[in-house]
């Protein structure tokens, strides 16, 4: 793998990890907000955040698969 591709892969991977870590923190806060407020909108936002986290995980797995394919 050339250096540019490797750097891009590592940067993308690090970015996904950062998004997931910050997302986990935000998710915990939103769980508290939804629980305390019992407002339907808070649960809607929480649900959207959970889906976004799952999507980022999928993208991370896709990135790893693409990296593996490039390195064949």
Listing of model-derived features with the role each one plays in the protein:
Residues 1-41:
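Extended, surface-exposed interaction regions
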Residues 24-71:
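Amphipathic alpha-helical protein-protein interaction segments
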């Amino acid at each position: 793998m050339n250096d540019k591709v490797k750097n891009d892969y590592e940067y993308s991977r690090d970015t996904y990890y950062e998004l997931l870590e910050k997302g986990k923190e935000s998710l915990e806060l939103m769980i508290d907000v939804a629980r305390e407020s019992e407002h339907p909108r808070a649960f809607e936002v929480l649900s959207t955040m959970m889906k976004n986290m799952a999507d980022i995980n999928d993208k991370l797995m896709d990135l790893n698969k693409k990296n593996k394919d490039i390195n064949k």
